[in-house]
Amino acid sequence: TKRLESVNVKSTSDNRLNFRNTLFTSSAMKTCIGGVILYDETIRQEDNSKKIPEIISQNGTVPGIKVDTGAKVLANSSEEKITEGLDGLRERLKDYYNLGARFTKWRGVYSIADKYPSKLAISSNAHALARYAALVQEAGMVPIIEPEVLMDGSHSAEICYTKTSEVIKKCYEELISFKIDLEGTILKPNMILPGTNSDQKISSTEIAELTLKCLKESVPNEVSGIAFLSGGQTEIQATENLNQINLMNKSNFIFTYSYGRALQQSALKHWSKNINDTTGTQDVFNHRAKMCTLAAKGEWTNNLEKN
């Protein structure tokens, strides 16, 4: 709803389905996209009597589902958030599996400020992520673990590094205590960046260095898949930084992308001007997906953006 309203398109069920289906039937789905994280509404939608997960699967892509119910105010730390959605999750997971989902996503969210994230927020969200992951693996699906340290604020990249390390280490401490099979999980972290209001100027190389150092020190070796969130970066920034991380990667980790805005925004803007221009919208989306996929191999250059 927010995405459509941001480009002045009325957020009706039909319009949401139109945009989603435009992306889901693009050629990039076959060549670039490995999985799609759906919302509860989307996984139940149909287009021409075909369920959305079926359309996605037919294009060689795996349907997944966001299963948390959002971040609420954390008791005894009202400036912070705790993600909810554990109640009834076991039953919902059975339903989602039957609807075609094969992986899931749960997002913990953390703010950086003088005294935040607090130990309470870090431990509460890590515990919730571990309980979620245990239920998902029990249901025969792959859990995406998403502890997002937000870019909001004036903090430096070095502070982001310290706080993100603390958050991720606590997540794995809880995941291990819940006997999670780490090989059957995917981590969706933020990159190490200065806050959006920070004066710090930092290169893509420095971002990659800090991000790689943080993850090598905080993530167990059994975790093979790491898919970055874009977290408010522009399309080009998110692509360039992912590319640099892969160029400098000497670990066994596979680094890819799990982008929302940084994958869809240009396509959404194009579509909003004429929601029936399926081909034009798909061309824009195909280009962005190709750029991100090249970056996931360390093969992107800025010159390719002009073509």
Task: Locate predicted features.
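Alpha/beta catalytic barrel-like cores
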Residues: T1-L99, I112, Q200, S204-L210, ...
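Conserved, mostly hydrophobic/aromatic
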Residues: T12, W106, I145, L187, ...
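Hydrophobic residues within beta-strands of alpha/beta enzymes
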Residues: V36, T104, P143-I144, T185, ...
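Residues that line or immediately flank small-molecule/substrate-binding pockets and catalytic motifs
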Residues: D40, G108, P189
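Proline-centered loop/turn at the N-terminus of a beta-strand
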Residues: V62, V142, G184-I186, G225
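Short, histidine-centered active-site or binding-site loop motifs used for metal coordination
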Residues: T69, Y110, V149, M191-L193
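Helix-rich catalytic cores of soluble enzyme domains
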Residues: L89-L175
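Catalytic core of soluble alpha/beta enzymes
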Residues: M151, H155-E222
